[in-house]
Structures are given as C-alpha cells and as structure tokens.
Amino acid sequence: MDTQRFQSQFHWHLSFKFSGAIAACLSLSLVGTGLANADDSLPSSNYAPPAGGTFFLLADSSFSSSEEAKVRLEAPGRDYRRYQMEEYGGVDVRLYRIPDPMAFLRQQKNLHRIVVQPQYLGDGLNNTLTWLWDNWYGKSRRVMQRTFSSQSRQNVTQALPELQLGNAIIKPSRYVQNNQFSPLKKYPLVKQFRYPLWQAKPFEPQQGVKLEGASSNFISPQPGNIYIPLGQQEPGLYLVEAMVGGYRATTVVFVSDTVALSKVSGKELLVWTAGKKQGEAKPGSEILWTDGLGVMTRGVTDDSGTLQLQHISPERSYILGKDAEGGVFVSENFFYESEIYNTRLYIFTDRPLYRAGDRVDVKVIGREFHDPLHSSPIVSAPAKLSVLDANGSLLQTVNVTLDARNGGQGSFRLPENAVAGGYELRLAYRNQVYSSSFRVANYIKPHFEIGLALAKKEFKTGEAVSGKLQLLYPDGEPVKNARVQLSLRAQQLSMVGNDLRYAGRFPVSLEGSETVSDASGHVALNLPAADKPSRYLLTVSASDGAAYRVTTTKEILIERGLAHYSLSTAAQYSNSGESVVFRYAALESSKQVPVTYEWLRLEDRTSHSGELPSGGKSFTVNFAKPGNYNLTLRDKDGLILAGLSHAVSGKGSTAHTGTVDIVADKTLYQPGETAKMLITFPEPIDEALLTLERDRVEQQSLLSHPANWLTLQRLNDTQYEARVPVSNSFAPNITFSVLYTRNGQYSFQNAGIKVAVPQLDIRVKTDKTHYQPGELVNVELTSSLKGKPVSAQLTVGVVDEMIYALQPEIAPNIGKFFYPLGRNNVRTSSSLSFISYDQALSSEPVAPGATNRSERRVKMLERPRREEVDTAAWMPSLTTDKQGKAYFTFLMPDSLTRWRITARGMNGDGLVGQGRAYLRSEKNLYMKWSMPTVYRVGDKPAAGLFIFSQQDNEPVALVTKFAGAEMRQTLTLHKGANYISLTQNIQQSGLLSAELQQNGQVQDSISTKLSFVDNSWPVEQQKNVMLGGGDNALMLPEQASNIRLQSSETPQEIFRNNLDALVDEPWGGVINTGSRLIPLSLAWRSLADHQSAAANDIRQMIQDNRLRLMQLAGPGARFTWWGEDGNGDAFLTAWAWYADWQASQAIGVTQQPEYWQHMLDSYAEQADNMPLLHRALVLAWAQEMNLPCKTLLKGLDEAIARRGTKTEDFSEEDTRDINDSLILDTPESPLADAVANVLTMTLLKKAQLKSTVMPQVQQYAWDKAANSNQPLAHTVVLLNSGGDATQTAAILSGLTAEQSTIERALAMNWLAKYMATMPPVVLPAPAGAWAKHKLTGGGEDWRWVGQGVPDILSFGDELSPQNVQVR
C-alpha cells in the first residue's frame, strides 16, 4: 500500500466510528499484552504485493462484427519469471470502446504501440486489514488464555469441546489479489474479467505444421502463449487493457466489415474499400492519409469503393478509415523510390582493365530523362572527374566539359606504383555525383587460347564425359606439343525455391591428368561419369615452352544445358479442347533431330507422348483438361532438345490458394498490338481491382465494371481474359496488377507487359579481317534506325580481346542503361496486416554485428609479346553524316592478337545503340628480345632473342648489327617459339638491331639500346663555367657520365636549373619524396597550358610521388623515414603533409579543411621534445596551409624566450660547410636556433602577434642568420626583410646537388614568389654529339650522347659569353 502518493480509496468508505473502534481494540490488545506477558508467538504475514512480470499483448489481425475478437498474450512460460506471475492467479482484462476513434488514432504518435496513461491504485488496504484482524484476534485469544489457569482451560474444553481453539489462530491469513489499476474513466467500459493465464490452452500451430531438424522445437505449444477471447463486438475501435500485478499493457482491436486495400506511389495514394467477407466494393468510407504527425489529406470513397489522394508520399504513412457502419481500419504503407527520372550519365572507359602507369580514356554521354521514354539533352556545364584508387584514396581530379550534344571526354594516367584492385570514377556535375569503375592489375595477357569441344551437347548421369581441348594462338594457328595439366572438381545440383543451387566443390580423381597436345593443338578429354546431376569445373593449365603458363577454367553441366531447338506457339495459353499448333526450329546445325514430343500436366503429373512427322516443323496438340503443361521435344535417344510451358484455361482450372496466376500471350509487344492476359483465381471471384502501374497507378478498373482501357471476358468461374491495347506510353514496360480480397484474406499478382523500344543499329566494318602489325586499318561505321540511315554521335574503341578474357566489360550495354526495364514504383498493402502491440518492459538494444568483407583476387595470366598495347584506337567523338556513315583509320599495333571494336552511339532524339566487330593482327615471323638492356662494366651479356614462327621447317636469315659489326645466321625454325643466341661480343653501350629475312624479303626487324654503367656509386656534381664562342675546355672527370649543359645566365634560368635538379633526384624516403613534390608543384603552376604533353608528364610525376607518400604512411597517417614500423616523427609527418598539400593545391585535388588538421596531431604530442628549428618550420607550413596555429605560435615564442641563449652563442663564427644540412644534421645548434628565432618573428608578424623575446636577442639572431653561409638561413632572412629577383638568384646560386633536398626544396618554394617572368636564354647547339632535351621546369638542356668524355665544348664565334651550368 502506497501511503504517500497512490492512496487506496478503500479508507474513504470506512466510517469514523469504525475507525475509532479499531483504534480502541488496538489499545486494549496492547495493554492486555503488557499485563499478561503472554506468549505472543504468532506467524508473521510473509506478505508481499504480487509484482507480476513482463509480457506481450498484441492484436495480430482485425475482426469483422460476426467474428469473435481476440488478443494474443505472450508471457514467459519456460523460466523463473513464470513463478513470479503465477501468484497473481491470471490476467485482468478490461475492454473499452473508443467513442471517437479517428480523433483517438490521430493523437497517437505510434499507431502500433498505443499509449494510454494508467490510473494506478497500488495494492490497497484489503489485505492489510485482513492481516491486522487475524493478528489482533490471535493476540486477544492469547491474553484470554493467560487469564485462566491451564487446568481450568482443560476442564472447560473437556466439558465443552466446541470451545477448544486448536490451530485457528496460527493459520496464515488468506489474501486476495486485487487489480492494482482502476478503470479508465475516459472510455466506456464494455467488459472486464480475469482470464486464467496458465490454465488456458496455449496457442499452437495448425495441424501438420512441423519444422524438420529444429533442435529448439520453438514452434511447440508453450504455456503463457495464449489467445484471450473478447466475444463478438459491434464495428468500431476498442481498447484492451491487460494487467498482471504492477505490469500493464494496452493495445487496440479493430472491428470492421470493411477492408482497405491501398496502392501508394510517389505523389499519389489509391484506396479501395471492399467487404471483408465477400470482397464486394464498399463505398462511403471516410479516409485520412497521415504520416504519423498530421493528416496530409482526406476523402471519401466513391461508388466503386476507390479514392485517389494526391500528396508527396513519405517513407512511411498510414491510412485511417471509418466505414458507413462505424467500423475502423488502419493500413500502414511503406514507399521508396525505385525509379528516379533525372540526369543519367553513362560513364565508361576505353577498356575495363589497366596496368599501373597506363593511360585511361573516359567518355561521358548523358540525357535528362522526364519519364521512362522521353528525354532531352543535358545542360552544357563544367564537371569534375575524381579518381579513387582501391584503398579509397583520391588520386587526382580532371576537369571535364560536358556538352549537350557530344557529352564529354577526358583522360588521365595511372601512377607507376598504382595499387591493384577496383578503382572508382566520381563525376561531379551540377551538384550531383555520378559513378563508374574500372580495375587495375599487374597482368600479362595469355598468348594462346584454350577452347573446350565436348563430344555431346548434353550428358546424362552415368555417362562418361568425353571431348577435346583445343589450343590456338590468337591468329588461329594450333599450339603443338604443349604440356597440359588437368584438374577436375564436381558440384552437385539441386533446386531450392525454383532456384538452382550448388553444393560444395569436391575433387574428382582423373587418370592421365598430364598430357601433350597433338599437331592440331587438340587434347583428348575423358572425364568420369557423374552419378547425380552436377556441375563439373575443369581447370586446364598449359605451356607451349614459353616462360609462363596459361590457365583457364571450363564449366560442364550434367543434365542441364541449353536447348538445341526453339519451341514456340502463337500464344502462351489456350482454351481446353482447342487445337494448339506448336512450331520448332533448329537453333544450330546438329545431327540431333527431334522425333517425339511429350507433355506433362503439372497438376496431376499425367503425361502423353506422340511422334513427330519426319522433316516436319510443327505439330498439333489438343489439351482436354485445363491446367499448366510442360512440353518437351526428344531425339531418338531420349535427350531433351527443346522445352516450353503452356497454360490451358477451362472449367475447374484454379490457382494455388492465396495466389493469382496471370499468363500473357506474348513476352514482347509492339505498340499497337493487344496484350492478352489470362487471369486465374483460386476460387470463384466476382470482384477485383485491376490496375496498370509504373510510376503511379496509371489506370484502374473493377472486375465487375470494366473501364474503357481494357476488355474483359469471363471464361469460367475462376478465369478471366483481359485484353489491353498496347500504346507507345507503355514502353519499355508497364505492370498489369490484379488485387482481390475474400474471407479476411487478400492477394495480388503483378505481370509485366514488355514493349519494344526503338534502338540505333550501329554496324562496324573493316576493309579486311586480317592485318599485319603497322598496317593501316580502315573502319567504316554505319548508324540506322528502323532500317533508315540516321546521324548519330559515336564513341569507338579498339581493344585487345584478351583483356575481356581477364576482365569482362564493366560498363553496361548502353541501351539497357538509358532504357532499362523499369521497376514498379507502386507499393500494395492492406488493413488486414496491421498489428498493434505493447510490451511491459522494453528490451535492451543489441549492438550490430561486424561486417565481413573479402577481397577479390586479381587474375594473373601471362602473355609474352613485343608491344604492350591494349587499346589500339580510341575515338571519343565521331559523328555519322545524313547517310549514317563515318570513317576512321588507325595503325595496327605491333601485337599479334584478336581485336574487338566496340561502337556506342546516340542520336539527337536520345535513342541509343551499340555495335561490335572483330579483326585480327597476324604475322608469320616476329621477334622479341629476351635480354636486359642495362649492364655493369665488365659484364659479358648472353644476348638472345625469341623468334615466333607460324611456319614449320622454313629457312630464314637473321642479320644483327652492333657497333658497326654485322653478323648473319642461317636458321631453320620450328613452329612456335624459337630461342636464338646471338654471336656478337657486346662489351660497350650502343644500338643493337636485328633483321629477319626470308627469300630476300625483310619479314621483321627490331632494335634496342644497350647501356653499360660504372660499378661505383654515382655522385652528382655540378659547376658553373663561363663559355664563349670557339673552343672551351671542360676539364671533366674521366668517369663522368650523364653530362648536361644548362644556361644559368639569368635568375630565372638559375631557378629552373635548381628546380630540374631537384626533380631528377632519386626518390626514396619521406624527405626525398616530399622534396620532389615541391618543385613538381612549382613546375605545374608555371605552365601556361595544362593540357599539353609536358603538363601530362608533370601531372604523372606528381601522381606517382603522392601515391608514394601514401604508401609510406604509418598508423594514424604518421611518417617515419622509410615507412618502417615505429612511432611517427612529428617533423617528418608535417613535411609529408605539407608536400602533399602543395601537390594537391597544384593539380586541383580538393580535400575538406579538417583533413589537413591531422598534420598537427603528432606535433601537439611531440612539440616539447622537438628542436626549435623543427617547431618553427612545422608552424610555418601550417600557417601557409591556413591551419589554426596562433596558440602554437605563442607557445613556440615562449619556448624561444625561455631558452636563454647566451649572446656569445650568436657571436660564434660559423665554420660549417655550405653543404651541411642545418635541418637534418644540426637542428639544435646556435645557428639553427637563430634561424628558428628569425622565422618565428616572421610568423608572428603575419599572425599579428607580439613576441616575448627580447629585442636584442632577436637582433643577434637576425645577424647570425644573415652572416652564415647556409642557403636556408639566407632564405629565412629574405622572408623576414623582403627581397627581389637578384637577391633570390644569389641564394639559388649557392644551392648544390650535395645539399639536402629538403632545404633546397624549401628555398625554391619560398623564393618562387620573387622570381619575375622572363623568357629563357637559348643556348645554341654545341659542336659534337650533343642532343637537346626538354626539362620539367620548362627549360631545356644539352646532353652528351657520344662515346667517352668530351674535353672541349665548341660554339660558333658569334656566341657572346654566357654562364653555363655543367652537371
């Protein structure tokens, strides 16, 4: 009993006199107890209010007025919680009727879980008074016992036994479990009762329902899982309240003789109200469409029981309905857009698979769609194409301009160190992002193909599988004497839910798993028989003597294959007793001929067979019974050659219970035809709702009153035939739907009407089918529509067919992309499936399970070839003329293979098409080097090459030339690969050439440059000399190599020379990689044309080095020197981030601002232990990157002030070498501290902060930095005080190749803004073997390509004296 808040109402019914009497009795009993000092040992109450327990209460269906309403209660009946509830004795149930159901439902936030606040009473005084009365009575009797002696009491009870008390006063009190909740006053109470929870018969599944193999036996009847009957109720809305102890749950029960069937689409809702028992249309129902927060719209159903409401559909919405009899129903609708009409961009690449370093060509074609069939040109606008690698890292962005007519195209080159895997293209266009993909792998294409030819088209179980493998080179020649290894695995087939499933793969033992191909390239194949329908997976690995093997896997299906004949009829259904003509035709030339036909009726498995006329093409069958039939054609051996399903209508034909069968007479319709639909119900039906659906309910009709968009014919009690005229607006497809309800159940079925969409016919034709490498290929393209020529925009690619053997085409067919079969955008639901529930205790949320990802393996097939060209031609934009013609040419690459030409096109009306053709490149004799091209001095190369011959035992002559000497070898080649050793004695660098002659004609020729390098480690040196007209002595070391001349006459040329020297530095760790990115970014910014060949080269180098930095990153994007394990260094991490930021800014790779904030994470952790110079440099980079660093700058300034550097430290003479690194070697020296002080002054000035360092200390630091010989110190002083191009040139002249790359890169980057744009001075051509070379920075140099080391450098007399840098 709660005496504070929830007081029992019982005490208001007790009179004051009665209360006083209780108090007097209590006082007397206490007095008596004290006087008598009697033994008051009475049992304690042991009373506790029944707590009850958690349970579920739900209404899992609605009810009609003639049905007994009931709710389901689920209590825990198999554990300790049951005993906590059993004490209560059952469940208290109250049933209320809701007076205004629509207003009540509108007030609920969750219609599934009705919330009605309880009126809690607690346990009350009833059991308390019972215990007090029993206790007081017992104590008073004890007092009376002590009043008389024991002998007196015995004498009295012997005389009058009825006065004997016995054990009455020690018996426990009898308590009554009262309902702890008072009735709800707001709603009329219909009935209340206590239902025996644990004695009631538990809910159990229907007879015959059993789950085989269920160890938990969870569908067996469980105590506490019961239905509580509520009796038959009048139509309306009822509230059910169930209580066990202090636990209470509520739910609502819908009673209505009307069912609401709804179809919701993007902006519309169609509601059909029908009788729950007979399914007839019921008009006059009030409908409210709500999203759970408010009513969106409302209406009343018309005479046909339908109502259309217009509003944008939310993801979840509800229909609240009230029929004319007062019945209430609720339907829940879920909607999501499955078809969205907006801009469609078709993004595809020239091929699906690339190597690292390859060029990727991208084409974009687009249309703005307004519905499934109608579109308009896209809006011309700029777009940005982003490339993401397999790790999700953003590699680069490319600007693409999309044109309304021609679309857009772009290209980029993959980094040389690109990771393998799937890459994603993201195109940002008009605030939307579109995606495509391609793959990158380190592959070599197979140099011959392996084909499988089986002895039979179909194999049965128990039959040995025989056939042959055929090995062919790309030009069609057989692979002789190839070593072949076979491996076989088998998977049994089974059918589950009409889907083909495969069991595990198990190896099968083979006899003769290793064999050799014959002269025709054939390998006999004999596999063991399968005892059950199976799939054989045969792995073949073959080698023709080349360095790499070719591996492929072939699939063989046992008792499941493709048909040899097509079997068709005029319609896919007919009437019983009607003669049906079936026609058959061969799909391919075969000796197998059908001799018999057989049909099987699926309903009763009856069958019939008959013979086919010899040489016939058709046969006639008269089906006497309605039903579903399977027809098959068999040959003389009983092998199935063709199959077809056919439906027969007639009296007695029914669908399966709960379903509707719809059979269309054709699979594809042309506009103007009539689609015939056979509708079969499971029982006699008089009323249903027929609709055409796609983006909305396009048309609707009742079965009893057909609308004008269709005609209906009733064939029998359960079958109807609907005829729907097909219009152009149906394309590419539309859904025909049938919906009905009966006896409290509803069913619907959809059937698609597929309509042909006109497509462009694009044909590709070459002037011949076979070409030799280097020949000119002429291609003719033809575009037509319905047989008439039409102008169109085409994109054509010529790709090695072997690429598609490694990676099938990723881009979808252009016709299926722009005009796919649309998904039905209408969702159907009913008020019969709405469930309301309540739970006494909410469950704890469960953490979601972790995702499981697996990586896809990359195929690694090998193919030796001379020229690695995978895309022979790429024409992103070709236009056919009014006659539908276009032409282009390309040179056949130096590769022997089969090429695929793919042409995709679109005309001005948005109609698309795709065509394909094939051609071959072949050559009887061709050569390929089999030796490296770089050697060390002293090596003795074993020179050789491969000659691939398509002839056998034909004499040829091999002529090789090197260093002026010519060698001739007469050879007899066998078919295939022939290795030939060369007889030249090669000991020096030079050009090696080879020529293959036959009958005096040159059949093939190749050449390569061989280089010999010194064994010692090369050290780059440079010097500046003054050169003039005439001879100039160079005085170079004897072992000098890679000699280059560059003009250094102007500051701009000095800057370019240093930039090029940094770019040419060998990459390696984080320092060098970042030091290459800085000058590359400067070179990119200096270019006037970012689309030139030079720009593409610089972009490629930036991509390679950015990716190199990504690969060096450790955990948390922190860096060590070489990417090794360990905690990241804050300075190296900041340098890597800064270099990447410079490169990203240069080439337009955008990142979110918070992305760069990670640069300062490691600095914040390690700043206290870092040298002042390192700290100053990191904050200088951070300030340049616009990162928030004012607080960090204050901390650095305070650290410099606390350092307390002595004045004599600044006055010490700096004797270090100019090539010593201040940053890497002595970052804590006095000079380094001075440079940090000066740099910090500059940073504070930019941030508008005041320094706490004493002015005299700052002046000493400035003087020490200015008087040093370190270029970094001079650069920092120049940044602090300002400068010009002349001062910049003086600093840059002091940069040498021996200095650290980070200091040179920083000087270049910080001094770039002082360089004015001036044209470079042209250095004329020197006399001798000098070759001009274009440099990354925009300048040029002269490189020595002759033998030995030049002693003098000669120019014309007219050359005025110039400063020249020799490296």
Swiss-Prot record:
The keyword Signal applies. Gene3D superfamilies: 2.60.40.1930, Immunoglobulins (2.60.40.10). Residues 1-38 form the signal peptide. Keywords: Signal. GO terms for molecular function: endopeptidase inhibitor activity. Pfam families: A2M (PF00207), A2M_BRD (PF07703), MG2 (PF01835). InterPro entries: A2M_N_BRD, Ig-like_fold, Macroglobln_a2, MG2, Terpenoid_cyclase/PrenylTrfase, YfhM-like. It comes from the Bacteria. PANTHER family: ALPHA-2-MACROGLOBULIN HOMOLOG (PTHR40094), UBIQUITIN DOMAIN-CONTAINING PROTEIN (PTHR40094:SF1). Belongs to the protease inhibitor I39 (alpha-2-macroglobulin) family. Bacterial alpha-2-macroglobulin subfamily. This is Putative alpha-2-macroglobulin homolog. It comes from Escherichia coli (strain K12). The gene is yfaS.
